[in-house]
């Protein structure tokens, strides 16, 4: 017992030294050109153009012809979702897609919010911009940039947007009313893909900051999960004076000695300040962290090394694309869903919503360019980029959803984000928080903003 206390004290001192030695710094606000060829000498067109999602008979006919040629491989007996997407259940998804899914209707739903495009650093950047339909007298909306990840899209935010822009209508307090901007990451959906290597999270952060500046916002809130959390973190590192607050539902934590402490075992976790909830979500460590990450990260290695190879198959087969993406909406929502024949997909999502997200990738042909984002960010390894070792000095809030792929205790998060003012253990939910639990996430964003406004 005494030896454990001494070791914990020594480790605590090492952590304190490691945490306190970093200085406040910012990422440089540089410039870039990601369009084809050399950057033209003429000034870039900064106009903001309305945009509508469209489809055609030819597009739908081609989709149906490809679906009709789907060739299934029978699953192993009792394999459920342990080998990936179960092809027996995939047949049900394909039948629904071919015979019941109405893409024209979903296009109308996509167009319920105003879409726009604007040129930034040589790329046509797509975004939706939703203003409040009503405001309390004398109040102005709070601008909020929300950034998606992979394999999601701007569509992930469609159910949370009205809770933020029109809270009173949906039974929520109108103390905070938001004006929401949801861009598509370059190379995702309707945002143009880069013609050049190197467009990573930092470049995307700069592009999105320029977007907010072009829209006239000098100070704003930002929110993200998955890649969106890293992009938003980079924005806060780049222009902290323009960010009123940063809210995350996932964190990229590297160069953080605290993230190694669970290896010391559950008893040391208590000495180091982990809560009972942290211990529940981290242990047994081998199963809940090590094995789970090993099971769920195969795609990451492929996409961080040779994304174009697997992309060729996915860009040619809509059913292959659906299986590849929808498998993530199963096990990333709850790892236990791999025990189910249908992967638990319809427990939290409708097939219409899931296939709408797939169609955004399919109709734009952006699965390859979206996968390249892994190569640009991880292709050189981890802990090689400047931003990975930098702290974030803006007010930060964090929603810890219990079924996230890797739980990040408050102790970990606070090392990277010293101004963490709100950390919430969420009641339920996994990786796709806005898509799965929009009300819970909206409530936590509002709670965080209430605290951030007091800073």
UniProtKB/Swiss-Prot annotation:
Tell me which Gene3D superfamilies the record gives: alpha/beta hydrolase
The entry's keywords: Acetylation, Aromatic hydrocarbons catabolism, Detoxification, Endoplasmic reticulum, Hydrolase, Lipid metabolism, Membrane, Methylation, Microsome, Transmembrane, Transmembrane helix
**Signal sequence segment:** none
Q: How is its activity regulated?
A: Inhibited by 10-hydroxystearamide and methoxy-arachidonyl fluorophosphate.
GO terms for biological process, alphabetical: arachidonate metabolic process; cellular response to glucocorticoid stimulus; diol biosynthetic process; epoxide metabolic process; hydrocarbon catabolic process; liver development; response to toxic substance
TM segment ranges? 1-21
Predominant subcellular localization, coarse grouping: membrane
Q: Which residues carry this modification: N6-acetyllysine?
A: 439
Subcellular locations according to the entry: Microsome membrane; Endoplasmic reticulum membrane
The EC number(s) attached to this protein equal 3.3.2.9
Q: What is this protein called?
A: Epoxide hydrolase 1
**Organism field:** Mus musculus
Q: What is the lineage of its organism?
A: Eukaryota, Metazoa, Chordata, Craniata, Vertebrata
């Amino acid at each position: 017992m005494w030896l454990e206390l001494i070791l914990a004290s020594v480790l605590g001192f090492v952590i304190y030294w490691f945490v306190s030695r970093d200085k406040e710094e910012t990422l440089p606000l540089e410039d870039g050109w990601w369009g084809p060829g050399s950057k033209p000498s003429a000034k870039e067109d900064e106009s903001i153009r309305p945009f509508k999602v469209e489809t055609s008979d030819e597009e739908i006919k081609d989709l149906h012809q490809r679906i009709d040629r789907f060739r299934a491989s029978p699953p192993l007996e009792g394999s459920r979702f342990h080998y990936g997407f179960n092809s027996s259940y995939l047949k049900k998804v394909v039948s629904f897609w071919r015979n019941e899914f109405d893409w024209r209707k979903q296009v109308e739903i996509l167009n319920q919010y105003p879409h726009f495009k604007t040129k930034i650093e040589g790329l046509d950047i797509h975004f939706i911009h939703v203003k409040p339909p009503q405001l309390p007298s004398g109040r102005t909306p709070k601008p909020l940039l929300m950034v998606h990840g992979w394999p999601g899209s701007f569509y992930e935010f469609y159910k949370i947007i009205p809770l933020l822009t029109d809270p009173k209508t949906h039974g929520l307090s109108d103390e905070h009313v938001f004006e929401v901007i949801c861009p598509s990451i370059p190379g995702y959906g309707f945002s143009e893909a880069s013609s050049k290597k190197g467009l990573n999270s930092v470049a995307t952060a700069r592009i999105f900051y320029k977007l907010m500046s072009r829209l006239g916002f000098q100070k704003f809130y930002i929110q993200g999960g998955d890649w969106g959390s890293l992009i938003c973190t980079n924005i806060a590192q780049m222009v902290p004076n323009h960010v009123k607050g940063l809210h995350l539902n996932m964190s990229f934590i590297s160069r953080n000695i605290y993230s190694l402490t669970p290896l010391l075992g559950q008893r040391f976790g208590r000495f180091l300040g982990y809560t009972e909830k942290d211990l529940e979500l981290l242990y047994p460590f081998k199963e809940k962290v090590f094995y789970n990450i090993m099971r769920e990260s195969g795609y990451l290695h492929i996409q961080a090394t040779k994304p174009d190879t697997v992309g060729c198959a996915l860009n040619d087969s809509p059913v292959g694309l659906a299986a590849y993406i929808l498998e993530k909406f199963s096990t990333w929502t709850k790892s236990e869903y791999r025990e189910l024949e249908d992967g638990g997909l319809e427990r939290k999502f409708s097939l219409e919503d899931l296939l709408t997200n797939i169609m955004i990738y399919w109709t734009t042909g952006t699965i390859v360019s979206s996968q390249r984002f892994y190569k640009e960010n991880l292709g050189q390894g981890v802990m090689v980029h400047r931003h990975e070792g930098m702290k974030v000095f803006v007010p930060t809030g964090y929603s810890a959803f219990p079924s996230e792929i890797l739980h990040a205790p408050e102790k970990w998060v606070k090392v990277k984000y010293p101004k963490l003012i709100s950390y919430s253990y969420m009641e339920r939910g996994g990786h796709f928080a806005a898509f799965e639990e929009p009300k819970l996430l909206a409530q936590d964003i509002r709670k965080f903003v209430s605290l951030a406004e007091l800073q």
